[in-house]
Amino acid sequence: MQGMKSYLQVSSEIGILAVGVALLMIAGEFDLSIGSLIGFSSMSITLLTVEGNMSIPLASLCSLLLTIFVGYCNGLTVVKSGLPSFIITLGSLFIVRGLTIAVSKIITGRTQLGGISESSGYDFMSSLFSSNLTISGVDFPISILWWILFVIAGYFLLNHTQIGNWIFATGASKESSMLMGIPVNQVKISLFIFTAFCAWFIAVIQVTTYGGADVLRGEQKEFIAIIAAVIGGTLLTGGYGSILGVMIGAMIFGMVKQGIIFAGVDADWFQVFMGVMLVSAVLVNGTFRKKYVHG
């Protein structure tokens, strides 16, 4: 049970991000800025709490507004410019991470900041985002429950609502969707906002778990979430994907990452695994796409 707890905890953070990433990918777009948004969100919460003397709930709300504004700007820039979202959000990644590091150094002289556990509202936020649920005598992080709720909500949205139909149609053919009256631009902007929300959610979990922030804590999370989505069957070209498949992809990553640690293998081998899985997933994805298009 202890081993299951460890890999599910890792999988839950990947999985929450991957739900947002997968929905956006199904709509035919990418967001490479979510990793930097985790660092941005966590540092903004901590700075507002420790340096600005805000309560953690209020600081978290302010951070949420800032984070979804970045997501909105990403989406608006993509739909208005017509440029690939890969390029737009790659630029956003560097802008957000650079600003987060620069502002953190200007205010505190550091890129890591703690002391949030003594702040007002910490116990309340911690109980919501980083407490434990006891099952069969084993304490499981509440983030696992949040992950399950995200999966259920994503599955219902994608498979049982008109919005889900719009997402599939937008990814399959933007032009045809617009001719059918589907609000393609609004769908895409909304999904960019949702991926930003997912990044903020992970940031709150991390801040309340570790009692502080590190500007680099979300580094490479964007790639892990994308790979988890692709492993789960989401097409890189859009128009097809499964939230349950994405959940399995996140579980695979969690098991491998913890397996490497438990085996006493150098953690750098996880980078090798990521690369192998990315190439393999792309190859399988290409084969699956041909069957999907011609089948």
Tell what function each PLM region has.
Residues M1-G52, T77-G82, V230-L244, V276:
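Single transmembrane alpha-helix segments in multi-pass membrane proteins
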Residues M1-S6, T100-V103, I107, L157-G164, ...:
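Inter-helical junctions in multi-pass inner-membrane proteins, predominant
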Residues Y7, S36-F40, P57-L65, I87-L90, ...:
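Hydrophobic alpha-helical transmembrane segments
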Residues G20-V21, R97-T100, W146-L157, F192-A203, ...:
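Hydrophobic core segments of alpha-helical transmembrane domains in multi-pass membrane transport
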Residues S55, A59-S63, F69-N74, V78, ...:
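Helix-loop-helix "hairpin" substructures at the membrane interface of multi-pass membrane proteins
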Residues S85-T161, V187-S190, Y210-G218, V293-G295:
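Transmembrane helix-bundle core of multi-pass membrane transporters
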Residues A172-E175, L179-Q186, V256, I260-G295:
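Cytosolic-side transmembrane-helix boundaries in multi-pass membrane proteins
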Residues A199, T209-G275:
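Transmembrane alpha-helical segments in multi-pass inner-membrane proteins
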